[in-house]
């Protein structure tokens, strides 16, 4: 009960990002030397939803509620993000995949579908590549994967300046200004910045202003060079992923390139475009995103 009260108190006041319904239970799960905040609801075959930067697992609420009618839905906050614990290290995506595998073990889930966005894609690839027998389908949404496909060319994009924005001085610059920093991404990477409303921005700014949160977010990016090494090794050792993959790019962001990237790492890829959206698919066009994901998982 004390844990439940503490978690509810941590929810930023006044946010319109919808809290998960009472049918979902939130708990801290010990895994791989840390603890992840995990929401679980529904019944049926399992599906794991992984978020990325400037979001938390809260982003998936509309999809999670829809899937819970016939799935057991598992929604963690990644290591060092949201309401999960903030360890000093372990931010390679290969290691964070072990976090998620440990969550599945704790919940006695052997196999699951997987839906990922942004940095969640990177953890998702490392999970599927290390445990291919445990991931039955994968929906990967609007972000590249270190070391896979045209990664080196993608790094040249001026929109990705933040991949190298880190260190003590950068953290001091951002401290107390988390809202300003996050607004840059909501505005620059969206098709229409007004679709990320004021309450949503306040909600995530409050979560990223929690102690150590921005430092750990920067650590996610700092791990990219090692992630690229790890992913190339995983692909070389295991070959292309065999499970069905739906690669969704936002119309005003990755677009069809998302599927092209995934075809370098998976052999059964279907491409799709989330229309009228930039990178923030669940904020900008949740109805289309939910419809495309649920249709694919139902096949």
Q: Over which residues does each language-model region extend?
A:
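Sec/Tat signal peptide C-region and signal peptidase I cleavage site
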Residues: 11-15
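Short hydrophobic "strand-cap" motifs at the C-terminus of beta-strands
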Residues: 50, 76, 248-250, 274-277
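Catalytic histidine-centered segment of alpha/beta-hydrolase-like enzymes
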Residues: 277-286, 290
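A short, glycine- and basic residue-enriched loop/turn
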Residues: 56-57, 122, 278
């Amino acid at each position: 009960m004390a844990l439940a009260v503490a978690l509810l108190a941590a929810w930023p006041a006044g946010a319109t990002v919808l809290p998960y319904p009472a049918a979902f239970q939130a708990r801290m799960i010990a895994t791989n030397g840390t603890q992840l905040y995990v929401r679980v609801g529904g019944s049926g075959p399992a599906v794991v939803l992984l978020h990325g930067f400037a979001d938390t697992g809260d982003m998936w609420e509309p999809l999670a509620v829809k899937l819970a009618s016939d799935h057991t839905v598992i929604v963690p906050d990644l290591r060092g993000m949201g309401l999960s614990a903030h360890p000093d290290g372990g931010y390679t995506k290969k290691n964070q995949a072990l976090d998620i595998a440990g969550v599945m073990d704790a919940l006695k889930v052997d196999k699951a579908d997987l839906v990922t966005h942004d940095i969640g894609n990177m953890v998702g690839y490392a999970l599927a590549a290390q445990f291919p027998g445990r991931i039955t389908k994968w929906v990967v949404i609007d972000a590249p994967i270190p070391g896979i496909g045209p990664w080196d060319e993608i790094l040249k994009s001026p929109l990705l300046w933040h991949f190298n924005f880190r260190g003590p001085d950068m953290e001091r610059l951002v401290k107390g200004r988390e809202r300003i920093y996050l607004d840059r991404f909501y505005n620059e990477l969206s098709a229409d910045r007004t679709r990320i409303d004021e309450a949503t921005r306040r909600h995530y700014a409050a979560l990223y202003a929690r102690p150590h949160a921005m430092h750990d977010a920067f650590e996610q990016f700092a791990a990219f060079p090692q992630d690229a090494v790890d992913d190339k090794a995983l692909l070389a050792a295991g070959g292309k992923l065999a499970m069905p993959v739906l690669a969704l790019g936002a119309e005003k962001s990755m677009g069809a390139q998302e599927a092209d990237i995934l075809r370098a790492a998976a052999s059964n890829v279907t491409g799709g475009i989330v229309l009228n959206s930039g990178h923030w698919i669940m904020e900008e066009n949740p109805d289309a995103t939910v419809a495309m994901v649920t249709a694919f998982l139902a096949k």
